[in-house]
Amino acid sequence: GVGPRYCPSIETKVDIGVHNLVSPDLAEICFDLGKLDDAVTILADSNEQVVAEKLRSLLRIGAASTRYKDVFDIYYLLCKKGVRERELDDAVRALVIEDPTMRERSYGDIANRLSRVFGDRRFKRELSRAKNNWLEISPDKVTSAITAYFS
C-alpha cells in the first residue's frame, strides 16, 4: 500500500527565530533524506546565542514567565553542555547589558533579578512540575547554579 502510514517519518520540532544575530557563528546541520538522494540543511544558533536569548526572555518577563523549560535549557547549556565564556559574554552584553530596553546593566543586576524571579513562590511551584524538568534535576540546584554563573 501507499500512503502516510507506509512512509517512514521522523517527527521533530524546530524553533524558528527572526532576530539580529549577535554572532554569525551558526552551526550548519545537514539531514540526509536517504533514498530521495537529497538533504536538508538548516542553520542553528550557537549555544551562547541560545543561552543569551533565553536569559533575555526570562529577565524581561520575570516571574510572570511561563517558559519554565527554558530554565532547564539554560542550566543544561551552561553546566552540562558547556559554553565558550567570551562568546557568551558578547551575547549577554549585546542582548541584555547594552540593550537600552533592558533594566540590567551588569552581571550583578542579572544575578539579582534571577534571584527574585527564582524566589517567586508561583514560579518555583510551576518550575518544580515534572513536565518542565526534562533533566530530572532538583529545581533548586538548577536555579542556584544559573544564578551563581551570572554572579
What is the predicted role of each segment?
Residues 1-151:
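Structured mid-to-C-terminal alpha-helical surface segments
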